[in-house]
Amino acid sequence: PAYMPKDMIFEMETSYKYIFKGEKDYLPFMEIRELHSSIKFQNINIETFKHNHGSIDVQTYRIGNFAYSTDLKKFYDNDIDKLRNLDLWIVGLLRDDEHPSHAGYDKIIEYINYIKPKKTIFTHMTALLDEKLLKSKCPKNVFPGYDGQIIEI
C-alpha cells in the first residue's frame, strides 16, 4: 500500500492512474490508503505529522524513539515538540545554506539543540556539502549518513 494524506490522494490517483487504477496494458499494483496522524503497520505504531517543504507539505515519521524527517524547511506550531526523547533522528540536510524548500545547516543544528536527540544522522545531502568540513563542524552526536549505511535502532 501507499500511505498519503487525504489532500494528496486525488492528485496521485490522477497523475499516476496506471499505478493505482490500471490503464491500458498496466495492471494496478499499488493501493492507496489514507495516512492519519497515527497508523499501525503490523505490530509497529507510526506517528506522523506534516512539516513544510517550501511550497508543499511532507511528513515526519516517528516510530518509538526514532524519527525521520527529510525535505524539511520548517516545523508547524509546536510539532517539533513531538520529537523530544529520541534516540535517533534522521533528518535531511540538502546543503549548508538555506534553500527555498530545505533548511540549512544552522537551522537544522538549532532544531537538534532544541529537541536534543541522542544521535542525529544527516541524509539527502548533495555534492555541494564538503564531507570533511561537515564532519569537522558537527556536534559529537551528529553525523553525515552515507549510502548503504546500516543503522541499528
Task: State where each predicted segment sits.
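Active-site-proximal loop/helix segments of hydrolase catalytic cores
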Residues: N52-Q59, I63-G92
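Binuclear metal-dependent hydrolase catalytic cores
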Residues: P1-S69, K135-I153
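Short, glycine/serine-rich, charged loops/turns that create anion-binding
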Residues: D7, H53, K73, R95, ...
